[in-house]
Amino acid sequence: MEDIQNYDINTIPSSSYNIWVAKRRSGKSVLCEYLIHQMIEAGLVDMCFLFSATDAGFNIIKDKECRFTDISKLDNILQFYKKANEYNKIVSKSKKIKLRTVIIIDDMAVDLKSKNFNILEDLAIRGRHYSYDPLSLHFHILSQSLTKVPRVCRLNCDNLFMNTIPSVTELEMILNENFYILDSSRTGKQDGKKLYHDLVTRDDFIFIVIENYKQNCKCYADYLKTYKADISVLDLK
């Protein structure tokens, strides 16, 4: 097996679109919260918002005004960023708005794909353009099912976090889109599939990170990482 390294939070793009796919109670929310904790510790975050129908978990976000059960509030944040982006284009460097924000959307992909909130694909394609330096905007989309996330979103995301995929159909989608890109021959596909299984069974609650933003990848280690939460630093009560 290739020498796949642990994920380093300092490699995350200045603005990013991230997808988390794993079944219920698999640890994806805990790992996402751990990533946010690491981003805060690294000085990469000023504000963090949670959109969740159940308003559960993510105790790291303590301010109730930053927790929403209605996805429609997301548009207010996006509109602010659009205006701040335009403002920063016309003012001097010292007057530019500097704001680094994380937005977590937890199992609300169905709402985002509805007629009223058809913004999931727009965020994947244009979301980063709402936040040019010194603005920063990170999206974390959590879903129990890969098929709930449109293919254009998967292909345009910066990072895809996942662990064991129980659905054969969804697993083949993951393998085709991410593990066969270096070698699509029969042997190459066998090697890619074996690597996936080796990584997801390496340790309990371990996740694979697919760094889609990486370019000129010549081996799996160039764009694949593993990631596991240190729960001792989190408030999981």
Go through the PLM ranges and name each one.
Residues 16-38, 53-56, 72-188:
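Conserved P-loop NTPase motor cores
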Residues 44, 61-64, 155-156:
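Short, structured coil segments at secondary-structure junctions
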Residues 151-237:
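Conserved GTP-binding G-domain of TRAFAC-class P-loop NTPases and closely related GTPase folds
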Residues 37-48:
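Post-Walker A helix-loop "phosphate-sensing" segment adjacent to the P-loop in P-loop NTPases
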Residues 61-76:
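Active-site regions of enzymes building and remodeling cell-envelope glycoconjugates
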Residues 1-13:
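Pre-Walker A adenine-sensing motif
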Residues 46-53, 67, 139-143, 209:
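Short, hydrophobic beta-strand segments that form beta-sheet elements in well-ordered domains
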Residues 49, 60-61:
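A domain-level signal for caspase-like cysteine endopeptidase catalytic cores
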